[in-house]
Amino acid sequence: MFMKKMAAFLMAFTLVCTSSPADLHTSAATETVYAAQAVAISSEEDLVAMQENPDGNYYLAKDITIKGNLNLFPNYYDYDTKVQHEECFTGSLDGRGHKIKNYTGIGLFDNAKNATFKNIVMTNVDLETPEMRMAEGCAALVLYAQKCSFSNITVSGKAKSSGAGIVYATEACNFTKCISKVDANIKEQKDISINSFAGIARGDNKSTFKSCKNKGNITLTGKANAEALFMVFGIAGTVKKIENCVNSGDITIKNTVDDGYAGSDFEMKACGLVEDSYGQVKGCGNTGKISVTNKDGKMTRASITVSGVIAEYRSSCSVKQCYNKGTVSFTGICSESSPGYISGVGAGGSMTECYNTGKIIVNTKDGVSYVGGVMQYGTKLKNCYNAGTVSLTGKGYAGGVAGKLSAGSCNYNVGKVTAKGKNAYAGEIAGYVTMESSVDNNYYTGSGKKSGGECTSWVPYQSKAKKVSSITF
Protein backbone atom coordinates (compact mmCIF):
# COMPACT_ATOMS: atom_id res chain seq x y z
CA MET A 1 0.00 0.00 0.00
CA PHE A 2 2.83 2.33 0.93
CA MET A 3 4.56 1.71 -2.40
CA LYS A 4 1.38 2.58 -4.33
CA LYS A 5 1.04 5.89 -2.43
CA MET A 6 4.71 6.68 -3.02
CA ALA A 7 4.35 5.98 -6.73
CA ALA A 8 1.32 8.27 -6.92
CA PHE A 9 3.23 11.02 -5.09
CA LEU A 10 6.22 10.74 -7.41
CA MET A 11 3.96 10.93 -10.47
CA ALA A 12 2.23 14.06 -9.14
CA PHE A 13 5.59 15.64 -8.26
CA THR A 14 6.89 14.88 -11.74
CA LEU A 15 3.87 16.57 -13.33
CA VAL A 16 4.33 19.67 -11.19
CA CYS A 17 8.02 19.91 -11.97
CA THR A 18 7.54 19.45 -15.70
CA SER A 19 4.57 21.81 -16.06
CA SER A 20 6.06 24.79 -14.21
CA PRO A 21 9.12 25.26 -16.46
CA ALA A 22 6.87 24.95 -19.49
CA ASP A 23 4.81 27.91 -18.27
CA LEU A 24 7.97 29.89 -17.62
CA HIS A 25 9.27 29.04 -21.07
CA THR A 26 6.00 30.23 -22.64
CA SER A 27 6.30 33.57 -20.82
CA ALA A 28 9.91 33.94 -21.89
CA ALA A 29 8.94 33.09 -25.45
CA THR A 30 6.32 35.83 -25.41
CA GLU A 31 8.96 38.35 -24.30
CA THR A 32 11.29 37.08 -27.02
CA VAL A 33 8.62 37.56 -29.68
CA TYR A 34 7.93 41.10 -28.42
CA ALA A 35 11.64 41.89 -28.47
CA ALA A 36 11.87 40.55 -32.01
CA GLN A 37 8.98 42.76 -33.11
CA ALA A 38 10.40 45.95 -31.56
CA VAL A 39 13.78 47.31 -32.63
CA ALA A 40 16.13 48.76 -30.02
CA ILE A 41 17.33 52.34 -30.50
CA SER A 42 20.65 53.00 -28.77
CA SER A 43 22.19 55.88 -30.71
CA GLU A 44 21.57 58.86 -32.95
CA GLU A 45 22.49 56.65 -35.89
CA ASP A 46 19.73 54.21 -34.89
CA LEU A 47 17.22 57.06 -34.94
CA VAL A 48 18.28 58.00 -38.46
CA ALA A 49 17.99 54.35 -39.55
CA MET A 50 14.30 54.35 -38.57
CA GLN A 51 13.63 56.13 -41.86
CA GLU A 52 14.39 52.86 -43.68
CA ASN A 53 11.37 51.22 -42.01
CA PRO A 54 8.71 53.89 -41.37
CA ASP A 55 6.07 51.50 -40.00
CA GLY A 56 8.38 49.68 -37.59
CA ASN A 57 8.03 49.39 -33.83
CA TYR A 58 10.92 50.84 -31.85
CA TYR A 59 12.01 51.38 -28.25
CA LEU A 60 14.81 53.30 -26.59
CA ALA A 61 17.31 50.94 -25.02
CA LYS A 62 19.30 53.73 -23.34
CA ASP A 63 19.58 57.51 -23.03
CA ILE A 64 20.62 59.17 -26.29
CA THR A 65 22.43 62.48 -26.72
CA ILE A 66 21.70 64.21 -30.03
CA LYS A 67 24.76 65.83 -31.58
CA GLY A 68 23.31 66.83 -34.95
CA ASN A 69 20.28 68.82 -36.06
CA LEU A 70 17.92 65.92 -36.79
CA ASN A 71 14.64 66.21 -38.67
CA LEU A 72 13.44 62.66 -39.41
CA PHE A 73 10.82 61.81 -42.06
CA PRO A 74 10.85 65.23 -43.77
CA ASN A 75 8.07 66.39 -46.05
CA TYR A 76 9.04 69.63 -47.74
CA TYR A 77 10.28 71.08 -51.00
CA ASP A 78 14.01 71.72 -51.14
CA TYR A 79 14.43 74.79 -53.34
CA ASP A 80 18.17 74.21 -53.65
CA THR A 81 17.87 70.68 -55.04
CA LYS A 82 14.33 71.16 -56.42
CA VAL A 83 13.24 67.91 -54.77
CA GLN A 84 9.91 67.32 -53.01
CA HIS A 85 10.51 65.28 -49.84
CA GLU A 86 7.51 63.22 -48.72
CA GLU A 87 8.21 60.87 -45.85
CA CYS A 88 6.09 59.89 -42.84
CA PHE A 89 6.56 57.83 -39.68
CA THR A 90 3.67 55.38 -39.20
CA GLY A 91 5.07 53.06 -36.53
CA SER A 92 5.56 53.31 -32.77
CA LEU A 93 8.26 54.58 -30.44
CA ASP A 94 8.36 53.60 -26.76
CA GLY A 95 10.91 55.55 -24.79
CA ARG A 96 10.63 53.22 -21.78
CA GLY A 97 11.50 56.21 -19.62
CA HIS A 98 14.86 56.84 -21.30
CA LYS A 99 15.93 60.34 -22.28
CA ILE A 100 16.66 62.02 -25.59
CA LYS A 101 19.07 64.80 -24.65
CA ASN A 102 20.14 68.10 -26.21
CA TYR A 103 17.87 68.06 -29.27
CA THR A 104 18.24 71.21 -31.36
CA GLY A 105 16.02 71.99 -34.35
CA ILE A 106 12.52 72.32 -35.71
CA GLY A 107 11.24 68.89 -34.62
CA LEU A 108 12.76 65.43 -34.17
CA PHE A 109 10.06 63.93 -36.42
CA ASP A 110 8.88 66.10 -39.28
CA ASN A 111 5.81 63.99 -40.12
CA ALA A 112 3.90 61.21 -38.38
CA LYS A 113 0.59 59.52 -39.20
CA ASN A 114 -1.28 56.83 -37.25
CA ALA A 115 1.82 56.59 -35.05
CA THR A 116 2.18 55.95 -31.33
CA PHE A 117 4.63 57.78 -29.06
CA LYS A 118 4.85 56.92 -25.37
CA ASN A 119 7.08 57.08 -22.28
CA ILE A 120 9.53 59.53 -23.89
CA VAL A 121 11.57 62.14 -22.02
CA MET A 122 13.35 64.93 -23.94
CA THR A 123 15.67 67.22 -21.98
CA ASN A 124 17.55 70.42 -22.77
CA VAL A 125 15.82 70.93 -26.12
CA ASP A 126 16.53 74.11 -28.10
CA LEU A 127 13.72 74.80 -30.55
CA GLU A 128 14.04 77.28 -33.40
CA THR A 129 12.59 77.46 -36.90
CA PRO A 130 15.17 77.95 -39.68
CA GLU A 131 14.71 80.93 -41.98
CA MET A 132 13.80 78.78 -44.99
CA ARG A 133 10.83 77.33 -43.04
CA MET A 134 9.87 80.43 -41.08
CA ALA A 135 6.22 80.18 -42.16
CA GLU A 136 6.03 76.94 -40.18
CA GLY A 137 6.48 76.42 -36.46
CA CYS A 138 8.68 74.24 -34.29
CA ALA A 139 8.21 71.55 -31.63
CA ALA A 140 10.41 69.08 -29.80
CA LEU A 141 8.99 65.71 -30.84
CA VAL A 142 6.79 66.02 -33.96
CA LEU A 143 6.20 68.94 -36.32
CA TYR A 144 3.12 67.55 -38.12
CA ALA A 145 1.04 64.73 -36.61
CA GLN A 146 -2.09 63.11 -38.02
CA LYS A 147 -4.19 60.61 -36.05
CA CYS A 148 -1.35 59.93 -33.63
CA SER A 149 -1.32 59.00 -29.96
CA PHE A 150 0.97 60.66 -27.41
CA SER A 151 1.17 59.45 -23.81
CA ASN A 152 3.60 60.07 -20.96
CA ILE A 153 5.73 62.51 -22.96
CA THR A 154 7.84 65.03 -21.00
CA VAL A 155 9.86 67.79 -22.66
CA SER A 156 12.08 70.42 -21.03
CA GLY A 157 14.31 73.12 -22.49
CA LYS A 158 13.75 76.36 -24.40
CA ALA A 159 12.14 77.70 -27.58
CA LYS A 160 12.90 80.80 -29.65
CA SER A 161 10.32 80.56 -32.46
CA SER A 162 6.57 80.21 -32.79
CA GLY A 163 5.35 76.66 -32.30
CA ALA A 164 4.64 74.30 -29.40
CA GLY A 165 6.47 72.41 -26.70
CA ILE A 166 5.80 68.82 -27.85
CA VAL A 167 3.86 68.72 -31.17
CA TYR A 168 3.24 71.64 -33.49
CA ALA A 169 0.38 70.96 -35.93
CA THR A 170 -2.11 68.17 -35.23
CA GLU A 171 -5.07 66.48 -36.84
CA ALA A 172 -7.22 64.15 -34.71
CA CYS A 173 -4.49 63.31 -32.19
CA ASN A 174 -4.82 62.18 -28.57
CA PHE A 175 -2.60 63.47 -25.75
CA THR A 176 -2.53 61.81 -22.31
CA LYS A 177 -0.29 62.67 -19.35
CA CYS A 178 2.03 64.86 -21.41
CA ILE A 179 4.12 67.52 -19.66
CA SER A 180 5.88 70.57 -21.11
CA LYS A 181 8.61 72.33 -19.16
CA VAL A 182 9.72 74.36 -22.17
CA ASP A 183 10.47 78.01 -21.44
CA ALA A 184 9.62 79.92 -24.61
CA ASN A 185 10.85 83.43 -25.34
CA ILE A 186 9.36 84.33 -28.72
CA LYS A 187 10.19 87.48 -30.65
CA GLU A 188 7.70 88.65 -33.27
CA GLN A 189 8.53 87.60 -36.82
CA LYS A 190 7.44 90.44 -39.11
CA ASP A 191 7.14 88.24 -42.20
CA ILE A 192 4.41 86.00 -40.74
CA SER A 193 0.91 87.10 -39.70
CA ILE A 194 0.49 84.69 -36.77
CA ASN A 195 2.97 84.59 -33.92
CA SER A 196 1.96 81.95 -31.39
CA PHE A 197 3.06 79.26 -28.95
CA ALA A 198 1.30 76.46 -27.05
CA GLY A 199 2.79 74.45 -24.22
CA ILE A 200 1.76 71.00 -25.51
CA ALA A 201 0.43 71.30 -29.10
CA ARG A 202 -1.38 73.69 -31.41
CA GLY A 203 -4.29 71.23 -31.60
CA ASP A 204 -7.40 71.13 -33.79
CA ASN A 205 -11.13 70.44 -33.44
CA LYS A 206 -10.60 66.66 -33.48
CA SER A 207 -7.76 66.39 -30.94
CA THR A 208 -8.20 65.54 -27.25
CA PHE A 209 -6.07 66.32 -24.20
CA LYS A 210 -6.27 64.51 -20.86
CA SER A 211 -4.21 64.97 -17.67
CA CYS A 212 -1.61 67.15 -19.40
CA LYS A 213 0.44 69.89 -17.73
CA ASN A 214 2.37 72.96 -18.77
CA LYS A 215 5.05 74.11 -16.36
CA GLY A 216 7.02 76.31 -18.75
CA ASN A 217 6.96 80.11 -18.86
CA ILE A 218 5.92 81.45 -22.27
CA THR A 219 6.61 85.03 -23.38
CA LEU A 220 5.80 86.64 -26.74
CA THR A 221 7.01 90.17 -27.47
CA GLY A 222 6.57 92.39 -30.51
CA LYS A 223 5.99 95.80 -32.02
CA ALA A 224 2.97 95.15 -34.20
CA ASN A 225 1.03 98.06 -35.66
CA ALA A 226 -0.63 96.33 -38.61
CA GLU A 227 -2.72 93.23 -39.19
CA ALA A 228 -1.25 90.59 -36.91
CA LEU A 229 -2.20 87.92 -34.40
CA PHE A 230 -0.36 87.21 -31.14
CA MET A 231 -1.51 84.06 -29.30
CA VAL A 232 -0.09 82.16 -26.32
CA PHE A 233 -1.74 79.16 -24.61
CA GLY A 234 -0.50 76.92 -21.81
CA ILE A 235 -1.81 73.64 -23.26
CA ALA A 236 -3.24 74.00 -26.79
CA GLY A 237 -4.89 76.26 -29.33
CA THR A 238 -8.00 74.37 -30.48
CA VAL A 239 -9.31 71.11 -28.99
CA LYS A 240 -12.24 68.75 -29.33
CA LYS A 241 -12.15 67.95 -25.62
CA ILE A 242 -9.82 68.70 -22.72
CA GLU A 243 -9.97 67.16 -19.26
CA ASN A 244 -7.97 67.42 -16.01
CA CYS A 245 -5.23 69.59 -17.52
CA VAL A 246 -3.33 72.23 -15.53
CA ASN A 247 -1.13 75.21 -16.35
CA SER A 248 1.31 76.53 -13.75
CA GLY A 249 3.57 78.50 -16.09
CA ASP A 250 3.44 82.27 -16.59
CA ILE A 251 1.85 83.33 -19.90
CA THR A 252 2.90 86.77 -21.16
CA ILE A 253 2.33 88.91 -24.27
CA LYS A 254 3.93 92.34 -24.63
CA ASN A 255 3.36 94.65 -27.57
CA THR A 256 5.08 98.03 -27.75
CA VAL A 257 5.04 100.40 -30.72
CA ASP A 258 6.87 103.65 -31.30
CA ASP A 259 4.90 105.38 -34.07
CA GLY A 260 1.78 106.33 -32.11
CA TYR A 261 -0.45 103.48 -33.29
CA ALA A 262 -0.81 100.33 -31.19
CA GLY A 263 -2.43 97.83 -33.44
CA SER A 264 -4.59 98.12 -36.54
CA ASP A 265 -6.87 95.09 -36.96
CA PHE A 266 -4.60 93.50 -34.41
CA GLU A 267 -5.53 90.63 -32.05
CA MET A 268 -3.92 89.40 -28.84
CA LYS A 269 -4.97 86.26 -26.94
CA ALA A 270 -3.38 84.81 -23.81
CA CYS A 271 -4.85 81.92 -21.87
CA GLY A 272 -3.68 79.39 -19.31
CA LEU A 273 -5.17 76.35 -21.03
CA VAL A 274 -6.79 76.63 -24.49
CA GLU A 275 -8.07 79.12 -27.03
CA ASP A 276 -11.15 77.21 -28.22
CA SER A 277 -12.98 73.92 -27.53
CA TYR A 278 -15.60 72.27 -29.72
CA GLY A 279 -16.73 70.01 -26.87
CA GLN A 280 -16.14 69.80 -23.14
CA VAL A 281 -13.61 71.50 -20.89
CA LYS A 282 -13.68 69.67 -17.55
CA GLY A 283 -11.59 69.67 -14.39
CA CYS A 284 -8.97 72.06 -15.78
CA GLY A 285 -7.17 74.79 -13.87
CA ASN A 286 -4.63 77.59 -13.97
CA THR A 287 -2.26 78.76 -11.24
CA GLY A 288 0.12 80.74 -13.45
CA LYS A 289 0.19 84.48 -14.07
CA ILE A 290 -1.56 85.48 -17.32
CA SER A 291 -0.60 88.93 -18.56
CA VAL A 292 -1.07 91.04 -21.71
CA THR A 293 0.34 94.51 -22.35
CA ASN A 294 -0.49 96.68 -25.39
CA LYS A 295 0.93 100.13 -24.80
CA ASP A 296 2.66 103.32 -25.99
CA GLY A 297 0.21 103.88 -28.84
CA LYS A 298 -2.41 106.61 -29.18
CA MET A 299 -4.93 104.78 -31.37
CA THR A 300 -5.91 101.15 -31.71
CA ARG A 301 -8.34 98.64 -33.11
CA ALA A 302 -6.73 95.82 -31.17
CA SER A 303 -8.92 92.97 -29.92
CA ILE A 304 -7.85 91.64 -26.51
CA THR A 305 -8.73 88.34 -24.78
CA VAL A 306 -7.08 87.27 -21.53
CA SER A 307 -8.27 84.40 -19.32
CA GLY A 308 -7.15 81.65 -16.99
CA VAL A 309 -8.66 78.58 -18.69
CA ILE A 310 -10.37 79.16 -22.08
CA ALA A 311 -10.39 82.20 -24.35
CA GLU A 312 -13.16 81.83 -26.94
CA TYR A 313 -16.94 81.47 -26.74
CA ARG A 314 -18.47 78.56 -28.65
CA SER A 315 -22.08 77.44 -28.21
CA SER A 316 -21.14 73.73 -28.34
CA CYS A 317 -18.54 74.11 -25.58
CA SER A 318 -19.41 73.25 -21.98
CA VAL A 319 -17.01 74.28 -19.22
CA LYS A 320 -17.34 72.34 -15.96
CA GLN A 321 -15.46 72.14 -12.66
CA CYS A 322 -12.64 74.44 -13.78
CA TYR A 323 -10.75 77.03 -11.76
CA ASN A 324 -8.32 79.92 -11.86
CA LYS A 325 -5.99 80.79 -8.99
CA GLY A 326 -3.49 82.94 -10.86
CA THR A 327 -3.44 86.69 -11.51
CA VAL A 328 -5.01 87.63 -14.86
CA SER A 329 -4.21 91.13 -16.12
CA PHE A 330 -4.34 93.51 -19.07
CA THR A 331 -2.60 96.88 -19.36
CA GLY A 332 -2.76 99.36 -22.22
CA ILE A 333 -5.28 100.13 -24.92
CA CYS A 334 -7.88 98.00 -26.67
CA SER A 335 -10.66 98.52 -29.19
CA GLU A 336 -13.87 100.53 -28.96
CA SER A 337 -15.61 98.44 -31.63
CA SER A 338 -14.26 95.07 -30.44
CA PRO A 339 -14.06 95.21 -26.62
CA GLY A 340 -11.45 93.51 -24.53
CA TYR A 341 -12.59 90.44 -22.58
CA ILE A 342 -10.64 89.61 -19.42
CA SER A 343 -11.72 86.96 -16.89
CA GLY A 344 -10.61 84.33 -14.42
CA VAL A 345 -11.92 81.18 -16.11
CA GLY A 346 -13.03 82.44 -19.54
CA ALA A 347 -15.90 81.65 -21.90
CA GLY A 348 -18.12 78.84 -23.11
CA GLY A 349 -21.59 77.92 -24.32
CA SER A 350 -22.27 76.94 -20.71
CA MET A 351 -20.25 77.08 -17.50
CA THR A 352 -21.01 75.22 -14.26
CA GLU A 353 -19.24 74.56 -10.95
CA CYS A 354 -16.29 76.82 -11.76
CA TYR A 355 -14.51 79.32 -9.53
CA ASN A 356 -11.87 82.04 -9.38
CA THR A 357 -9.68 83.07 -6.46
CA GLY A 358 -7.04 84.96 -8.46
CA LYS A 359 -6.76 88.72 -8.94
CA ILE A 360 -8.30 90.12 -12.13
CA ILE A 361 -6.67 93.47 -12.93
CA VAL A 362 -7.36 95.71 -15.94
CA ASN A 363 -5.88 99.15 -16.54
CA THR A 364 -6.80 100.70 -19.89
CA LYS A 365 -5.96 104.04 -21.45
CA ASP A 366 -8.43 103.69 -24.30
CA GLY A 367 -11.07 101.25 -25.51
CA VAL A 368 -13.81 99.29 -23.71
CA SER A 369 -13.33 96.21 -21.53
CA TYR A 370 -15.63 93.59 -19.99
CA VAL A 371 -13.97 92.18 -16.89
CA GLY A 372 -15.32 89.17 -14.98
CA GLY A 373 -14.17 87.20 -11.97
CA VAL A 374 -15.25 83.89 -13.50
CA MET A 375 -16.66 84.42 -16.99
CA GLN A 376 -16.06 87.12 -19.59
CA TYR A 377 -19.45 86.81 -21.29
CA GLY A 378 -21.85 84.72 -19.25
CA THR A 379 -24.41 82.45 -20.92
CA LYS A 380 -25.83 79.49 -18.99
CA LEU A 381 -23.63 80.33 -16.01
CA LYS A 382 -24.59 78.24 -12.97
CA ASN A 383 -23.20 77.23 -9.57
CA CYS A 384 -20.03 79.29 -9.96
CA TYR A 385 -18.32 81.65 -7.52
CA ASN A 386 -15.66 84.34 -7.32
CA ALA A 387 -13.50 85.07 -4.29
CA GLY A 388 -10.81 87.10 -6.04
CA THR A 389 -10.41 90.85 -6.43
CA VAL A 390 -11.80 92.26 -9.69
CA SER A 391 -10.60 95.75 -10.61
CA LEU A 392 -11.02 97.92 -13.71
CA THR A 393 -9.39 101.29 -14.33
CA GLY A 394 -10.61 102.83 -17.57
CA LYS A 395 -13.74 102.46 -19.66
CA GLY A 396 -15.98 99.40 -19.41
CA TYR A 397 -17.76 97.02 -17.04
CA ALA A 398 -16.47 94.89 -14.17
CA GLY A 399 -18.46 92.09 -12.53
CA GLY A 400 -17.70 89.80 -9.63
CA VAL A 401 -18.93 86.73 -11.49
CA ALA A 402 -19.19 87.90 -15.13
CA GLY A 403 -18.18 90.93 -17.14
CA LYS A 404 -21.28 90.56 -19.30
CA LEU A 405 -24.19 88.28 -18.39
CA SER A 406 -27.27 87.09 -20.28
CA ALA A 407 -28.22 83.91 -18.39
CA GLY A 408 -27.04 82.82 -14.96
CA SER A 409 -28.35 81.43 -11.68
CA CYS A 410 -27.12 80.13 -8.32
CA ASN A 411 -23.81 82.00 -8.53
CA TYR A 412 -22.17 84.08 -5.82
CA ASN A 413 -19.42 86.61 -5.27
CA VAL A 414 -17.45 87.42 -2.11
CA GLY A 415 -14.58 89.22 -3.87
CA LYS A 416 -14.11 92.99 -3.99
CA VAL A 417 -15.20 94.60 -7.27
CA THR A 418 -14.11 98.11 -8.31
CA ALA A 419 -14.36 100.23 -11.46
CA LYS A 420 -12.60 103.60 -11.72
CA GLY A 421 -13.06 106.06 -14.56
CA LYS A 422 -15.58 108.37 -16.19
CA ASN A 423 -17.31 105.52 -18.00
CA ALA A 424 -16.48 102.61 -15.69
CA TYR A 425 -19.21 100.54 -14.02
CA ALA A 426 -19.01 97.78 -11.41
CA GLY A 427 -21.48 95.11 -10.30
CA GLU A 428 -21.18 92.58 -7.51
CA ILE A 429 -22.53 89.84 -9.82
CA ALA A 430 -22.26 91.23 -13.37
CA GLY A 431 -20.68 94.24 -14.99
CA TYR A 432 -23.46 94.43 -17.56
CA VAL A 433 -26.68 92.44 -18.01
CA THR A 434 -27.99 92.10 -21.56
CA MET A 435 -31.56 92.46 -22.80
CA GLU A 436 -32.22 88.73 -23.22
CA SER A 437 -31.31 88.20 -19.57
CA SER A 438 -32.46 85.29 -17.46
CA VAL A 439 -30.53 86.03 -14.30
CA ASP A 440 -31.79 84.94 -10.87
CA ASN A 441 -30.88 83.43 -7.49
CA ASN A 442 -27.43 84.98 -7.39
CA TYR A 443 -25.84 86.22 -4.16
CA TYR A 444 -23.12 88.62 -3.04
CA THR A 445 -21.67 90.03 0.18
CA GLY A 446 -20.27 93.36 -1.08
CA SER A 447 -21.80 96.80 -0.66
CA GLY A 448 -22.13 97.61 -4.36
CA LYS A 449 -24.97 97.18 -6.84
CA LYS A 450 -25.84 93.76 -8.23
CA SER A 451 -24.85 94.93 -11.74
CA GLY A 452 -22.97 97.87 -13.19
CA GLY A 453 -25.54 98.34 -15.94
CA GLU A 454 -28.63 96.74 -17.47
CA CYS A 455 -30.09 97.37 -20.90
CA THR A 456 -33.72 97.43 -19.74
CA SER A 457 -35.59 99.18 -16.96
CA TRP A 458 -38.65 96.94 -17.29
CA VAL A 459 -38.84 95.48 -13.78
CA PRO A 460 -40.01 91.91 -14.60
CA TYR A 461 -36.98 91.42 -16.83
CA GLN A 462 -34.33 92.88 -14.57
CA SER A 463 -31.70 90.56 -13.16
CA LYS A 464 -32.27 89.22 -9.68
CA ALA A 465 -29.54 89.02 -7.06
CA LYS A 466 -29.54 89.27 -3.28
CA LYS A 467 -27.09 90.81 -0.86
CA VAL A 468 -26.35 88.54 2.11
CA SER A 469 -24.24 89.05 5.22
CA SER A 470 -22.02 86.03 4.64
CA ILE A 471 -21.51 83.00 2.44
CA THR A 472 -19.87 79.79 3.62
CA PHE A 473 -17.95 77.73 1.09
Feature map (PLM): residue ranges:
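A periodicity- and composition-biased signal for non-globular, repetitive helical segments
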Residues: 10-11, 473
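Hydrophobic core
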Residues: 11-15, 19
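Sec-dependent signal peptide recognition
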Residues: 4-9
